[in-house]
Amino acid sequence: MAKTNTGRWLAGAAGLAAVGSVAGVSVARAVTRRTTDDDPHHGEDFGLLDADRSYVVTTPDGVPLAVREVGPADAPLTVVFAHGFCLRMGAFHFQRARLTAQWGPQVRMVFYDHRGHGQSGDAPSDTFTVSQLGQDLEAVLAVMAPRGPVVLVGHSMGGMTVLSHARQYPKRYGNRIVGVALISSAAEGVSRSPLGEILRNPALEAARFAVRYAPKTVHRTRGAARSVIGPILRAASYGDEKISPSVVAFSEKMMHDTPIATLVGFLHALEVHDETPALKTLAKIPTLIVCGDRDLLTPKEYSESMAEALPKSELLIIGGAGHLVQLEQPELVDDALVRLVERATPSKLVAITRRLRDRARNHG
């Protein structure tokens, strides 16, 4: 029996690794071509967020979440960013860098790492669920934004986190939470995307079993699990082969640094989550839905489906972009976030615009 299971495990790993290698070859070719061109982000300080004001928010079950903050503590609006699967808050690097100047003192931005990701603490594998992530977001909001209007921005699993929060805390929306952006995300499990095929791989099942029931042996499944998921994640990240090599290296490091227990632990959550009831709550407020038309992990059909259910949504499909659209096409994403804030807080933005015009006139 054990021999048969081992054979199935190896065959499954080889089969999915072959699928992954096809994607990996396309990435390797693209990266090779990219390195021959000028890199617009050579020398970029991707550690910018690490220098911002630092806090730790401890969840009710005792997990320390790393938090960064930029902007005045008394800003009229707070924008909270939730990153995606196998990433960390740095995935919003360009939003942090550019929107700080765009919004100035009128907006405070808060970023945090999910449990098991980045600089946040580890957690039991049975807490690696989308519902738990929604509760973690509530813990961050309770400490970092206890008063005043808030806009939530979620990328990939971070978008699912926002949806989970909306399902569990619907009374927060329309009153405290005045706008939401869902970037490269989905309201229900991603079993219909290429990621869904990966989730059924015996290699990942073995790693998931080790994480849950034999954590001391998880290192034995590390290589097989990464060989299955890694190439797919890398291939799906960017749609344009002209993407900056520095940006590619930055995102790949985030993925590589994610603990294997986190990687396999959250995969099942991505497959089975269903936050479609949250769409009824989000229908009350302005929303932004963004997706690249070359996103292989959360294809644009997921975004289009959410937009149909949200009458106050702006749907932005970015041509040629992959799953990490906020790193690949930051200007388009940033502009869309500015529009969302303007729609979510129109009265405040009118006053802000008037003050800026008066200031410019006085200095003219």
Feature annotation, model-predicted:
Residues 108-160, 167-173, 335:
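Active-site loop/oxyanion-hole signature of alpha/beta-hydrolase fold enzymes
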Residues 308-364:
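Catalytic active-site module of serine/aspartate enzymes centered on a nucleophile-bearing elbow/loop
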Residues 5-32:
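Hydrophobic alpha-helical topogenic segments used for membrane insertion/localization
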Residues 63, 68-122, 143:
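Conserved HGGG/HGGXW glycine-rich cap/lid loop of the alpha/beta-hydrolase fold
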Residues 282-283, 289-291, 295:
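Short beta-strand/loop motif that positions the catalytic acidic residue
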